[in-house]
A protein has these predicted regions:
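Conserved N-terminal Rossmann-fold NAD(P)-binding element of oxidoreductases
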Residues: 27-29, 52
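Hydrophobic/small residue at the entry helix of a nucleotide-binding pocket
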Residues: 33-34
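Conserved SAM/SAH-binding loop
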Residues: 97-106
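Short, well-ordered coil/turn residues at beta-beta hairpins
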Residues: 120-121, 144
Length: 224
């Protein structure tokens, strides 16, 4: 019988596939960025995934988030992903957590159990706290910078936080990371200047998260 990862094994070899199967990766934020990361991880054969997000699928997610469909509308994203992962690789172990990671909730996580951490959160204080906790535990981490109001997918690159430019989120991260003693941090960011938007949005944009501190969401698309 053909193994579903047969073509992946051609590239990584049996030992590489075994490492992926034994790996435990935590993805913090499973929206536009984190969602595609989860998809790639499960299709590559990663054995255990921790999904951390307290958001539910909403209408404005449909333009870019892989988990967003009319069928998943209103569901917690981590729950919808758990079901999707099971349909792709039933042997994968999934730990969905309906919680917003931040300085107030960070103590609820044991980072020593992770082999790798992906930061796809959009809150600066949470991103910095995540970087601090991962580095304290000696766990590799990559942090996603801003993709809102961007149109050029070729402008993205992986580099160190302190080598970034242009990105407003990276600028804010640099300031806070220096204060927390973070000397280096692998990030993916875009060299493209953010656009201002060609037209106002139809209807209310900020539907992803309710409560105080709501802000106008940036423009987004499925290819950046």
């Amino acid at each position: 019988m053909v193994d579903q990862f047969a073509r992946t094994q051609v590239q990584f070899g049996p030992d590489g596939m075994q490492r992926l199967y034994q790996a435990r990766v935590a993805v913090f934020g499973v929206g536009g960025v984190g969602g595609y990361a989860v998809e790639a991880l499960v299709r590559s054969g990663v054995g255990t995934l921790d999904l951390i997000d307290d958001d539910k699928v909403c209408l404005t997610n449909l333009n870019r988030q892989i988990i967003a469909t009319y069928e998943t509308m209103g569901e917690y994203k981590v729950d919808a992903f758990a079901r999707r992962i099971a349909s792709i690789n039933p042997e994968a172990v999934v730990h969905p957590r309906r919680i917003f990671f931040g300085p107030q909730t960070a103590d609820q996580f044991d980072f020593r159990q992770y082999d790798y951490v992906i930061d796809a959160i959009d809150t600066v204080s949470a991103k910095v706290e995540l970087a601090v906790r991962a580095q304290e535990a000696g766990v590799p981490i990559i942090s996603s910078m801003g993709a809102g109001n961007k149109l050029d997918p070729t402008a993205f690159e992986v580099t160190d936080l302190y080598k970034t430019s242009v990105c407003p989120l990276a600028r804010a991260m640099r300031t806070l990371c220096r204060k927390r003693g973070i000397r280096q941090l692998k990030v993916v960011y875009s060299r493209e200047q953010p656009t201002t938007g060609a037209a106002p949005a139809a209807g209310r944009l900020d539907t992803d998260r309710e409560g105080p501190g709501k802000r106008q969401s940036p423009g987004s698309n499925a290819f950046v």
